[in-house]
Design a protein with these regions (language model features):
Chain A
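Transmembrane alpha-helix boundary and packing residues in multipass membrane permease domains
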Residues: 27, 102, 132, 136, ...
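Generic hydrophobic transmembrane alpha-helix motif, especially the helices
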Residues: 61, 95-96, 105-172, 200-202
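Glycine-rich helix-loop "coupling/hinge" segments at transmembrane-helix boundaries
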Residues: 123, 136-138, 166, 207-208, ...
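Transmembrane alpha-helices
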Residues: 80-96, 186-218
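Gly/Trp-centered helix-boundary motif
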Residues: 1-94, 98, 102-103, 110-113, ...
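Hydrophobic residues within alpha-helical transmembrane segments
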Residues: 22-25, 76, 88-95, 118, ...
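Alpha-helical membrane-protein architecture signal
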Residues: 4-8, 64, 72, 76, ...
Length: 339, 389, 344
């Protein structure tokens, strides 16, 4: 495995999740206060010719567009709009996915067949072309239609995953025991099954948000959303339309592009952390452990303390003996023998 | 000195056949056409001495459809009663249908034919309110303490639910839950309320399962292998607890197990199941001391008995190698044919003759309290039981 | 004759953020060629940790913190000194595995790969350790199934098509693939019915007589060991409490825990008597308390028990001394035994 690969594998889940959370938190902060603190109205086109497609300066920290609009302001509004849309789609689609997935697995029989059929059909439809078609035909182009369309196409994957998990849980004894106690069906679903799926639902939510960001940026880039609102994709649309790349106006398309990439990355990191936190088994088999200061892989034979410390040398052993939980203070045994 | 136990059957008196050929499938598929010949003998249950009849299984049959036209008769013509304050043990190997019987009695499955009677009236276990009312009288305890408790809820919450559902109008739920924990000897009860299942040992979890069943204040407790998954050293304590609960709460207890020794220790009446049928029934002491059916004899001979430890497992003897040869030849034949049309045990039984393979016997009476389903009862000489050292 | 496996003062711990869990504490055990040694203990007693730690199969965060595990099989030592598994490299251990020491794992249901046929799994084991061609390996797999009494036709079956007893036999066949000297059996019959269990045990004895390997049989069911084993070691909370021949343990249990265990089995042929079992539950290994770990559950405990160093001492008894020494960690019961003579 390559060095970066090894490093990635070994980072503990908590670190990944923390980095992801902090990064996403920053963007969330930007989304909330950004539009309040932005220096200019993003749509304001400054007619001053020296400020057309101008490089970043003290006045315009990220430069200006072809029509003299401030890129930084657009970026801040864009972050808010994009995150807003993505979170809304995440909530709606995940709620739908959980509802459909748990119900179909719990009820079984006809309902399971029917709901599975519905989710499979939606899964199979190629999403982007359908999105383009729908949005192309809808009279409005604003945020709302985009949210609706993305939610409608974004729930089936989560539904399938939740259904699979629910099928497994449904066969566990404690569900039958809840029935034995006389619990009603809906209470079993709400209080016995779903609490066991929290980390799955959280991961599914994050996944959906990620998908929504990607899809909305793609749609905006293609010009299918409201071009009067400044989402990140719209900025890129205009930048592309005005030949920003060819003209070398990197300050116009790099910031929104990087923002999209970073938001996506932060979500992926968050998700990895959730996966491993939710499944202790993943944690245990993850990678090497450190024992007595040395790295031990799961496929190595059980380490023997004497061997580990012997190869460290005296100074290392001396220093290590101060670490907490040191096993070096094992006293001579007085054990018996089976002869 | 006891008979050397060779290959699972006593070396004398019965031909040594050793390894049963029917080792291929865990559930001996019973031929659905193998109807029992004759009516099962009416027997006075040894448990009836303890108290009135509370629950009765009447000619229960359960056939599972396996898809592609195949079906599995898991339970055939099983009838018995549960009496207040008495323990009835249902003994059999995996695949014998004993768990299915319990599920039929619990209302988790519906019989294909036959009836479950509760206090003289047919049990009404349709969904909804009727089912919940049934649950207030008949409770089922699960086998696996590691999966019968919800891992995300505390013990206190999981016990409070059945209390609220069944003890309507109880003011202090916490006090009721504490009382339940004390009943199952989880004390001091207060410290268990906030614990999660993974913080408890197997034995403690199983006690919580008992407490949950008792919250409904049932009259009948169906315990499906309640101690099989616990360590040997705590099994006895749990059985003693069950016995104590039975006595104090006047429960009718159905104890399902594959361990016939614990059935002898604990039960009033023992019912032995094989291949979905009852093959023997009678008072616990008599069935275990003088087993009449060849399968019961096999069970008794195979069980490790601390008072009667045969030395046959250690040290090769001539009879040992003879047994192993015949065992090997038996198993080489494998078991890939359709189930026998007659007695389900006939493919493994050393006494089986043509009648056994053709006709499936119903329970034949042996005494007012005993019966066994076998055509060869006269020839099935029980192995001499050694006196303790 | 020197023992084929000599575990001496072995200690194994699991590193955990809250402090180390000492799962095995200074346990010594020997296995002579061709004998069956039973290791008895509840869940959490450390019996599996002992076996897997000795063969270095435990994954991190487990560490072997002390002791030695000397293997004296003739193929490896060539008549010389035994080799210590704890000092071997990964490569040397790989040579040892399966050819010298093999393991029949608990719960064959889970140990067999559900998506591979029996033949493929046997071939895996065979070709990993023996230099055979595919054809030779296939023939060997068939021979192994013959050995354990499974029809050859079953080679093409998947594990779920076999019964529990047959799956366990496949595991045994796999363990014998490279003709080892020592076979460690970890609760091989736990999930099986009594009838199948007895057949498997008889099969094991027969194979042992034929092929001549030694068996370390791990279980929580003492009654099995009393029938099957030559010598028995009783473990509790990571320590050995009592060791001796099966006869001695059965007739003169010299530790309150062993007595409690023997008193936990309802008898089939003896009189129907009231049994007490052992109250309480095993201690938390993170904080077992000083002295003997059995104190909270012991009816004979006195203040001095809290200061025991848990070394094993011979039992003075009314029985004539046999070739196998009978040792116990409980000084109180040892004296009782000598006073009371043979117990029933």
């Amino acid at each position: 495995m390559s060095a970066p690969g090894r490093v990635w594998r070994n980072l503990p889940a908590k670190a990944k999740a923390k980095v992801g959370a902090v990064l996403f938190g920053l963007f969330l902060l930007a989304a909330v206060i950004g539009p309040q603190v932005m220096p200019y109205d993003p749509s304001y086109a400054n007619p001053d010719p020296s400020l057309l497609m101008a490089r970043p300066s003290a006045q315009h920290l990220l430069g200006t567009t072809q029509t003299g609009q401030d890129v930084l302001s657009q970026l801040l509004v864009g972050i808010r709009l994009t995150i807003e849309l993505a979170l809304l789609v995440g909530v709606i689609a995940t709620a739908a996915a959980v509802l459909v997935g748990v119900t179909s697995a719990f009820l079984g029989g006809f309902w399971d067949e029917f709901l599975s059929l519905v989710s499979n059909v939606f899964l199979v439809i190629p999403a982007l072309p359908l999105l383009i078609l729908l949005l192309g035909y809808l009279p409005q182009r604003g945020q709302l239609p985009t949210i609706i369309v993305l939610s409608v196409l974004g729930w089936p994957w989560g539904a399938r995953v939740v259904r699979a998990q629910t099928l497994m849980i449904r066969n566990r004894d404690f569900i039958a025991a809840a029935r034995e106690s006389g619990e009603r069906g809906w209470r079993i679903i709400a209080f016995d099954i779903i609490p066991n799926e929290v980390s799955l639902i959280a991961a599914s939510f994050v996944n959906t948000v990620l998908y929504a960001i990607g899809a909305s940026v793609a749609l905006a880039f293609v010009g299918l959303t409201d071009l009067n609102s400044w989402s990140l994709g719209t900025i890129l649309y205009w930048a592309q339309g005005q030949q920003a790349l060819q003209l070398g106006a990197w300050w116009w398309f790099v910031p929104p592009g990087v923002a999209v990439a970073l938001i996506g990355t932060s979500l992926v990191l968050l998700n990895t952390g959730i996966d491993e936190l939710g499944s202790p088994r993943l944690r245990a088999t993850r990678g090497a452990a450190r024992i007595a200061g040395r790295r031990v892989w799961p496929t190595d034979p059980t380490p023997v303390l004497a061997q580990l410390t012997a190869s460290r040398g005296r100074l290392g052993g001396f220093l290590h003996s101060f670490s907490r939980g040191s096993l070096l203070d094992e006293t001579t045994p007085a054990g018996g023998e089976l002869r | 000195m006891s008979e050397p136990i060779v290959g699972g059957l006593p070396a004398s008196g019965l031909p040594v056949t050793g390894e049963p050929a029917a080792d291929a499938s865990a559930a001996p598929a019973v031929n659905a056409d193998a109807e029992q010949v004759g009516e099962p003998a009416a027997v006075t249950s040894a448990a009836a001495a303890r108290g009135p009849l509370i629950m009765e299984a009447v000619a229960l049959n359960k056939v599972f459809q396996l898809g592609r036209g195949a079906s599995l008769q898991a339970v055939r013509n099983v009838s018995f009663g549960l009496y207040q304050g008495a323990v009835v043990a249902l003994v059999g190997e995996s695949g014998s249908g004993k768990s299915t019987v319990a599920k039929l009695l619990a209302g988790q499955e519906r019989p294909t034919s036959g009836q479950v009677m509760l206090r003289g009236k047919p049990a009404d276990v349709r969904r909804g309110r009727a089912f919940r009312r049934y649950k207030a009288t008949v409770q089922y305890v699960f086998q696996d303490p590691f999966s019968s408790l919800n891992p995300v809820h505390t013990v206190g919450y999981q016990l409070s639910r059945p209390v609220k559902l069944h003890q309507a109008g109880v003011r202090d739920v916490r006090a009721a839950v504490t009382a339940l924990l004390e009943q199952v000897r989880l004390t001091p009860a207060g410290q268990y309320l906030a614990k999660y299942p993974h913080e408890l040992s197997g034995g403690q979890r199983q006690r919580v399962s008992f407490a949950r069943a008792l919250a409904a204040q049932p009259a009948v407790l169906l315990a499906d292998e309640p101690v099989s998954m616990l360590d040997v050293s705590i099994r006895l304590e749990m059985l003693n607890l069950l016995d104590d609960l039975r006595a104090r709460l006047s429960l009718a207890l159905l104890y399902i197990t594959h361990d016939i020794a614990s059935a002898r220790y604990f039960a009033d009446e023992v019912l032995v199941m094989y291949g979905g049928q009852l093959v023997e029934r009678g008072p616990a002491e008599e069935v275990t001391q003088r087993p009449a059916h060849p399968y019961t004899q096999l069970l008794i001979a195979s069980a490790p008995d601390p008072d009667n430890l045969g030395s046959a497992l250690k040290g090769g003897s001539a009879s040992q190698s003879r047994a192993s040869q015949s065992r090997a030849s038996q198993s080489r034949a494998g078991n890939v044919g359709p189930a026998p049309a007659g007695c389900p045990f006939s493919s493994r039984c050393p006494l089986a003759d043509d009648k056994c393979r053709r006709e499936n016997p119903a329970l034949q009476p042996l005494s007012p309290a005993r019966a066994a389903a076998c055509w060869r009862l006269d020839a099935a000489v029980p192995p001499p039981v050694a006196s303790p050292r | 004759m020197s023992p084929v496996l000599d575990i001496s003062g072995l200690s194994v711990a699991y590193r955990a953020p809250g402090g180390d869990v000492r799962a095995v504490k200074h346990v010594s055990l020997t296995l002579n060629a061709g004998e069956v040694v039973g290791l008895c203990g509840e869940s959490g007693s450390g019996k599996s940790t002992l076996a897997y730690g000795a063969t270095r199969l435990l994954r991190p965060p487990a560490v072997v913190t002390g002791g030695s595990v000397r293997y004296g099989g003739r193929r490896v030592t060539a008549g010389g000194d035994p080799v210590d598994l704890l000092t071997m490299s990964h490569r040397e251990l790989h040579q040892m595995r399966w050819r010298e020491i093999s393991i029949v794992f608990q719960s064959a249901m889970n140990a067999l790969n559900p998506v591979l046929r029996v033949q493929d799994q046997l071939l895996d084991a065979i070709r990993a350790h023996l230099p055979l061609s595919r054809g030779q390996a296939r023939e060997k797999a068939a021979t192994l199934l013959d050995l354990v009494g499974i029809p050859r036709g079953r080679l093409r079956s998947y594990p779920h098509e076999l019964s529990g007893g047959m799956r366990q036999r496949v595991m045994i066949a796999m363990a014998l693939a490279a003709d080892p000297e020592v076979v460690i059996m970890d609760e091989p019959t736990t999930a099986l019915d009594v009838v199948v269990q007895r057949d498997i045990l008889a099969q094991i004895v027969e194979l042992k007589e034929t092929l001549g390997f030694a068996v370390l049989f791990i279980t929580h069911d003492l009654s099995l060991l009393l029938e099957l084993a030559d010598r028995i070691a009783v473990m509790y909370a990571g320590r050995l409490l009592e060791t001796g021949s099966a006869q001695a343990i059965m007739r003169e249990p010299a530790h309150p825990y062993t007595r409690g265990l023997l008193n936990s089995f309802p008898s089939l042929s003896g009189p129907r008597r009231e049994l007490a079992g052992i109250p309480g539950s095993p201690p938390d290994l993170r904080d077992p308390g000083p002295g003997c770990p059995f104190i909270p559950r012991c009816g004979h405990a006195v203040a001095a028990c809290g200061e025991l160093d848990m070394s094993l001492a011979p039992v003075t008894s009314g029985l004539p001394p046999g070739p196998v020494s009978h040792l116990t960690a409980c000084p109180i019961v040892a004296t009782q035994v000598s006073q009371e003579g043979v117990l029933s």
